Amino acid sequence: MELIRRLFTAALVAGVLSGTAASVVQQATTVPLILEAEKYEVVTPPPAPAVAAPGAAAPAAAESHHHGPVREVGEGVPTTLDEAMQRIGLTIASNLLTGVAYALLLSAAMLLAGRPVDARRGLVWGAGGFVAVSLAPSFGLPPELPGMAGADLELRQLWWLAAAAGAGVGMAALAFARNRLVIAAAVLATALPHLVGAPHPESAEGAVPPELAAHFVTASLGSAALFWAILGAVCGWLISGLVGEAEHRPALRVQPGAR
């Protein structure tokens, strides 16, 4: 019971620290990009050109050339201070919950591995989490801004789970497995989602400018890397004592003839 309590305490501390740091960074990097992209969510088509006489076709074409789609502010853009603060609060709460959940998984994996761990080794564990959860899935499904074209949500979620699980299994096999067949199977599991391909819409057209989308991908991966670095280092530092206790815990011995 003491082990579980300390495990949850370590996960809570690591999750709060990493979630808070990610929230601060996102307010300066990804959130402004999201707000900018939401301005492109509502697009009013340009007015249809009026049918004119053959002699007026050229002026009409020239006039229609200067009229493009009218951009309007999307409904998700906060217009008051209360709405903005509410969005910030929801972002922080989401990051904190996500941090605690991932910290529990990472701490449990450290204990199950049974290897010595500290803040430095925890940083390596955090790098593995970043690769599995953020980097590997981004090769097929990079972070998307509002207003970008996307395939069916359920298909994307299933592919993301397969890519993240495959990357995690592959790295675990490379780090701990000794059987070559196991390693080969794990590598195949890592590559399989990417060989099948991520689900994409039939048309990649979207209202968001490509340079804005590319900037968002790099900013999102950067904040995710910071999140996992803090998460792994803090988890490793706090879990180090638990792993040491588990290694030196005396095994239960049964005396001959005892019942």
Language-model segments: which ranges?
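Juxtamembrane/disordered regions of integral membrane proteins
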Residues: 1-259
